[in-house]
C-alpha cells in the first residue's frame, strides 16, 4: 500500500493544519480523499462574503482542482459530504443546481448534506469534502 500527500500550489496553503489531498494506492486501485474545500481563493481570501451560492461555486472549483492534482476526475467521485452553516431548505436548490454543472444527473455521487453551527472561520458558509476511487 502506498500513500501520497498532496498540497496543490493552485489551492490555499493550509499545510500547517492539514493536507489537501491524500491518495492511497493498493492492488491497482487508488482511493482519493479530498479535504474540506471552502469558498476562498489561493490567498485564503473569502469569495462571496455572505453569498452562499458564490462560496459554493468557489468551493466546487477548489474541489475540482484538488481532484485534478491526484490525476482524478469528477467521474471518479463516489461520495461527497457538504457541511452547511445554519442549513435552510432553500440551500439544497443552490447546491443541487451547482452540483449538476459538475456531475451528470445519472452519475451523481453518494452525498450527505449536513447542517452545522459553524465552520473553521465564522464567514465560511459551506465546506465540501469527498472521496474518489480510480485505477492507479
Regions found by a protein language model. Name each.
Residues 1-61, 65-70, 75-78, 85-136:
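N-terminal presequence-like segments and the immediate start of the first folded domain
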Amino acid at each position: 500500500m502506498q500513500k501520497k500527500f498532496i498540497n496543490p500550489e493552485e489551492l490555499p496553503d493550509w499545510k500547517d493544519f492539514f493536507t489537501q489531498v491524500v491518495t492511497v494506492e493498493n492492488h491497482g486501485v487508488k482511493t482519493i480523499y479530498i479535504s474540506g474545500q471552502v469558498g476562498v481563493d489561493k490567498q485564503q481570501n473569502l469569495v462571496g462574503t455572505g453569498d452562499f451560492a458564490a462560496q459554493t461555486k468557489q468551493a466546487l472549483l477548489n474541489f475540482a482542482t484538488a481532484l485534478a492534482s491526484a490525476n482524478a476526475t469528477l467521474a471518479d467521485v463516489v461520495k461527497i459530504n457538504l457541511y452547511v452553516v445554519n442549513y435552510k431548505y432553500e440551500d439544497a436548490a443552490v447546491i443541487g443546481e451547482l452540483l449538476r454543472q459538475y456531475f451528470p444527473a445519472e452519475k451523481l455521487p453518494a452525498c450527505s448534506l449536513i447542517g452545522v453551527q459553524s465552520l473553521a472561520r465564522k464567514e465560511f458558509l459551506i465546506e465540501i469534502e469527498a472521496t474518489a476511487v480510480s485505477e492507479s
